[in-house]
Structures are given as C-alpha cells and as structure tokens.
Amino acid sequence: MGEVQREKVAVIIGPTAVGKTKLSIDLAKALNGEIISGDSMQIYRTMDIGTAKVTKAEMDGIPHYMIDIKNPEDSFSVAEFQERVRKHIREITERGKLPIIVGGTGLYIQSVLFDYQFTDDAGDVIYREQREKLALERGVEYVHEKLQEVDPESAERIHANNVRRVIRALEIFHTTGEKMSEQIEKQEKELLYDVSLIGLTMDREMLYDRINLRVDLMMEQGLLEEVEGLYNRGIRDCQSIQAIGYKEIYDYFENRASLEDAVSQLKTNSRRYAKRQLTWFRNKMDVTWFDVTDGEKTSEILRYIEGKLQVKSNNSK
C-alpha cells in the first residue's frame, strides 16, 4: 500500500504590520484557498481594532476561520486552538480548497503543524492542592508570581485568573524540572502536513515606522472607544485584556497612565512584540523568508508555493 498523502497547508507568518493580511487574500484568490487565522487574539468578538482584525471588505469573499469565536471574558488554550484548526484544515481540504494559515502567534501555529500532545496527567495531586490553597489564602497574583519566577514564558501567556492553568504549569516544573514551554518543544517534532511555510520580513526601521503608524490609525478608527466598551462591560483580569492594544489603554481608564503615555507604551510594546515574533519564528521553525522592504512579492511567493506543494494557481497556464 502507498503512503497516506498528507494534507497540503500554506502558512504565512511574520511580525505585526508586515503585510500578511493582503498577501494571504491575494494568495487565497490565486490558489483557491480559504484562510485560517493563526492569531490568538482575533478569536475574540468585539475586539476588532486593537487586534487589527481583517474586515469583511478586506476579505473580499474569501472565507476566514478562527475569527470572532469567543467572548472577551472566555479563556482559550493552545490545545483548543490546535483541535479547532486541525478540524478546519480537514474540512477545507475535503472541499477541494487549500487551507492557508495566517498569523503571528508562534506557539499556536506550531502546535497545529507538529505532532504535539497536550495532556492533563495525574501529576502531583498534593502539590496541586497546596497551590490551590495558596491561591485561596494569598490570592491568584501570588501564585502567578511564583510561575513568573520559574517559567516567565508561560506566565506571560497564562492570565493570573486562569488558576488551573497557572498551577498546571507550576506542577509541570515541580515534577519534571522543565518549563511547560520547554516540555512542549521537546516532543517529537513531526510535521503532520505537507507544509509551505512562508515568512515575511522587512527593514526593521521601516517595520517600526509601520507599527507606529498603525497604532495612530487604530486610535483614529476608535480603539479608545472599543476598549472603553469592554471596560464598561466590567471585563477585567481576562486573558483577552492581556493583548497588546488593550492592556495599555486599560491603564488609561484605571488612571495609571495618561492617554498620551498609554499610546506611547502601546507603540513600544508593539515594536517589542514584533521583535520577539521574528526571533521566535527564526529559532523555532524552518521558514522560507521573503523580504518585502521594497514592495510585495506576491508573484514570487505564489511560484514558491506552487513548487513546494505541487499545486496550480489560477494564474498558471
């Protein structure tokens, strides 16, 4: 019997504001594709401006998935993302279309493409119960600070109020001596799909200028009012509000910063995030990079995907 044919998946990654959205839609049109968002924050309804969510007009008729599937007060795990996206890949493939994952949340995308297992093993029950007691007696922030000390990557990703996941990460470190993030990465990295992994990059100063401009545009489009709406709904201490673009403006509404300082901090945090994204993708994934400093490379990228995945575009003769 022949080898089972793996599903074909195109993946477009890159830092915030580099131009992934337009490229992905152009590619989807050319390759008969449908788009899956690989951004961990675009899943939240009513959080449109701050997450730079693709608009209906920009979609131009191309189906998009993993957008507006959760309320801002809901939590969302890497494991749930993995399960949902893999289901979308199957369904898109069954319709004879090409799944195109677009995004910037590296661990989430990696969890889909590779054979990662997320388990809730029995672990150390006594240790877990002790942490639960500490959370009750001394507060969730205290337990979260303990995680920050041993596994800052997980602490940044998991909100303090998500006590179960905070304690799970602490428990993994306690029982194995490894960070949760390291344990995930140590698993056998077998690609589950036939993947074309495209990365967009550009001159750093140009990228930072684009990020600053994007933040100014977000403010003009009504980011302040968008965040105020969440604030007035009483949404506090949720995973969604940890997103860049929201936590900074929350500081303004809670009188911890002036609006000018909040916007300045938003720009700084966005630039730092872009730098972290690039570092993460370069260190963790085998990406073919295209420099778009001098303009888009849609035709070149299209030819690359055609060759890598052995698919034909609508532009092919």
From Swiss-Prot:
tRNA processing as UniProt keyword: yes
Keyword Magnesium: yes
Region described as Interaction with substrate tRNA: spans on this chain: 39-42
Residues binding ATP: G14, P15, T16, A17, V18, G19, K20, T21
Cofactor(s) required, per the database record: Mg(2+)
Residues noted as binding substrate in the record, renumbered to the chain: T16, A17, V18, G19, K20, T21
EC number(s) given by UniProt: 2.5.1.75
One Pfam family of this chain: IPPT
SUPFAM superfamilies per UniProt: P-loop containing nucleoside triphosphate hydrolases (SSF52540)
Alphabetized Gene3D superfamilies for the sequence: 1.10.20.140, P-loop containing nucleotide triphosphate hydrolases (3.40.50.300)
Keywords: ATP-binding, Magnesium, Nucleotide-binding, Transferase, tRNA processing
Coiled-coil positions: none
One Gene Ontology biological process: tRNA modification
Catalytic activity: adenosine(37) in tRNA + dimethylallyl diphosphate = N(6)-dimethylallyladenosine(37) in tRNA + diphosphate
Positions bearing the site annotation: Interaction with substrate tRNA: T105, R128
Any one GO molecular-function label of the UniProt entry: tRNA dimethylallyltransferase activity
Classification via HAMAP family: IPP_trans (MF_00185)
UniProt function note: Catalyzes the transfer of a dimethylallyl group onto the adenine at position 37 in tRNAs that read codons beginning with uridine, leading to the formation of N6-(dimethylallyl)adenosine (i(6)A).
Subunit structure: Monomer.
Sequence similarity: Belongs to the IPP transferase family.
Name of the protein: tRNA dimethylallyltransferase
Annotated organism of origin: Bacillus cereus (strain ATCC 14579 / DSM 31 / CCUG 7414 / JCM 2152 / NBRC 15305 / NCIMB 9373 / NCTC 2599 / NRRL B-3711)
Gene that encodes it: miaA
